[in-house]
Every structure is written in C-alpha cells, then in structure tokens.
Amino acid sequence: MVTEMDVKPVRSRDLALIGYDHATATLEVVFRAGGVYRYQQVPETVYHALMSASSHGTHFQKYIKAQYPYVKVS
C-alpha cells in the first residue's frame, strides 16, 4: 500500500514525473508517452541518485528499470 508519494516533475525526453514513497520504498514513474509504473523495494539512495542524475531517462534505464519489481498502475 502506497502512503504519501512525493512527486516531482523532471526534465526528460521520456519521463514526466517521478514520485517516491519513503515509508514503502516505492518509486512511481510517469512516462510522457503514457503509462504509470510503480517500482517496489527501491532504496532511498537509488531515488536520490535518480533525481540528481544528469539524465533521468538514462539513469532510470540503466539502474532501475530491470533491477526492481514493478506493477503498471495505468
């Protein structure tokens, strides 16, 4: 269960919004082309690295997409 999501817009060709729920270690990614995904068991350090990356999309593809379990929300 997701509690309170801290959602922020990002400058990325592929990603529109990134949210993180500190209580559940859930990362939510909203794609510009459509689709919302929730990645589970994502450490807070991984979220901070994503948010401070020079390319959010590249960082997401390399370090998160295939590394954590996820569900498609919409």
Model-derived features: where do they sit?
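Acidic/histidine-enriched, beta-strand-rich ligand/metal-binding domains
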Residues: V2-S74
